[in-house]
Amino acid sequence: VQRFLSARKNRKVTIAEIGAEAQPNNRAVLSASEVEKYDPETFADNLALAKERARKGKGCNAIIEWSPHSNIELNSNGSPLRLGSNPEESFVVLAHELIHAQHILAGTSKAYNGGDRYDETSEAGKEELRAVGVGKYEYRKTRQPSENSIRQEHGLPIRKKYKPHGR
C-alpha cells in the first residue's frame, strides 16, 4: 500500500495492490479527521458520506485498487476487449484510476451521481468518458490529463470508448 498526499485540501490517495485477475477500482473514503467530525456509525455510512463529498465540491480521500500486472487490451477499433496481463502497460490502468482519484479529491466526481458506467448518457458513464478522454473530454478540447493523453504520450493505441466490445 502506498499513500500520496494531494496539495489541495490536504487529501490523500492510497494505492492498494490487487491480484492480476481482479478488476481495478477506486473508492471515495473519509479521512481520519472527517471520521472524527462526522462520526459515521458504520463503514457503509463512511462510504455514503465520502461519496457525497466526492461529487459535491468538497472532495475526500481516495483508495485505488490496482494491479501492476494488468492492462486493458483493445481491439483494432480501440474498443476494450478484456483485462490483460501485460505489466508493461499496467501504468495506463493506474493513470485511468488516478484521473478518477483526482476528481474524487476535488469533489467533481460524476461516478456517484447514479447510472450505469457503461451508459455514456448517465453521470457514471460520463465520469468514465472523462477518465478515458473521449468525445468532449478529449485532451485537445479540455487540456485535462486522461487515459488517452497518457496512451498518446507513450505511443500506445488510443481507446475509442469505455464500454467493452460486445457488452
What residue spans do the PLM features occupy?
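Short, surface-exposed beta-strand/loop "edge" segments at domain boundaries and coil↔beta transitions
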Residues: 1, 21-25, 71-77, 137-143
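Zn2+-dependent metallopeptidase catalytic core
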Residues: 1-35
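Ser/Thr- (and often Asn-) enriched beta-sheet segments in non-cytosolic proteins
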Residues: 12-16, 29, 63-65, 149, ...
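An amphipathic, basic-hydrophobic helix/alpha-beta surface used to engage anionic
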Residues: 94
